[in-house]
Amino acid sequence: TYYAEDHPRKSELLDFYVANTVKILSDFGYEQAIALNHAENIVKFDAILAQYANTSEEWAKYAELYNPVPIKAFIEALTTVPFADVIEGILGKLPDKVIVYEKRVYANFDAIMNEANFELIKSWMLVKLIRSSTHYLSDDLRILGSEFSRKLSGTSEARSQEKHAFDLATDQYSQAVGLYYGHTYFGESAKADVKRMTTEMIKVYQERLDKNTWLSRPTIDKAIKKLDAMTVFIGFPDKLPDIYKQFTVTHESIYSLVARFNVVRSHRHYAKFNEPVDKTEWHMPAHMVNAYFSPDSNTIVFPAAILQKPFYSETEQTKSQNYGGIGAVIAHEISHAFDNNGALFDEFGNMNNWWTDEDFKAFEAKQELMIAEFDGLDIAGAKVNGKLVVSENIADAGGLTAAMTAALRETDVDLKAFFTQWGEIWRIKASQEYQQMLLSMDVHAPGKLRANIQVSNLDEFFDTFDVKEGDGMWRSETDRVKIW
């Protein structure tokens, strides 16, 4: 966090934030002195929150954040806010338990939310509301409201009005835009081909698990059982969310429409309390170039937009290239079922430790090897936090290995094309500031390191490119990290 005393850009960023906030508040009609007071107050209150908030590293280990607290204990622990009334007013009843993700905030809540801090809290709420509203007002305010994020990421100019209009539409109707994209640009033939690759990748994983040498048989059998139960979604969902039926577009201002839509979303969110979970619901629109594994449903999802070059092409890329692209991504998402977080969920998506103690200790030892391999690597004028990126690195390692195994089964395999495609999908164009920001918060390693470090764990890479000891990408056999 840039509130930390040792953050190299602390003064630069916070001073800029205050000045930018004063400009925004002034445009809303606040006098300079009052605007400055509010801006300084929000920084003071943010600094208080930063002392207790989870770190990026803690958020990365999300399975460890599950901390259920009985409702009686929860209410008694937080005395400065009448949470019994608040929760009952929202849900209509009190739940049995509350899941506390931020233990330090919970333990220090009364020291944060109290009468002494009330003026800071009021400024914090006011400024947050005003800054968030700038996206929906004049174009000058939109540009002014995004100045701080551009400063943080090193972006030279605001998004164009055209792109902003697209952002507004997709923010409110993401699944509708995704469904249009899927129907327009994604074909059944490509879907069938990717489904075939996914089936092959799961089969490879099952075989590799069956031959695993560091797990006991009971754990191997349960891991294979989890693979057998995995659900795969490809392309786009079959239906739109029902909530869209409650969205009515009128000639109100954009701000009023968004505010009304947010109320609808909030009501729908809390109405889901104690309802059965819809495991067919997509949490990512089809036009997004991404993919994900959902641990609480044991589901992997590949939106239509990622099923294009350089990840995949049915007609313009070879099978080896496709395995190095989308194949590795598919296997990466499968691997998340067995990373340091996903491994704590069973085949039904329930948090349930299905490992023997001895097996999990062996797994943790392998995690430490992956942490050490990346920790402290220099890039973009900063260093990698190995603990922050370990889950994604485990998935990358397992995914690349499984995809290569599948590619080798093809009669026309070309490992040079396979590895080259893997490198191509991680190309990135970004400012140094943006890369440094990601290093502090993103659970993924930088693209260049994802491309180059992971391949150096595979013996086949050295054979394919004739890499010898003394070459830049050489890694001795004893230092090559292999997990799945």
Residue ranges and their predicted role:
Residues 1-200, 237:
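Noncatalytic, helix-rich "gating/capping" subdomain that lines the substrate-entry/channel surface
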Residues 42, 48, 77-81, 92, ...:
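Intrinsically disordered, low-complexity linker/terminal regions across diverse proteins
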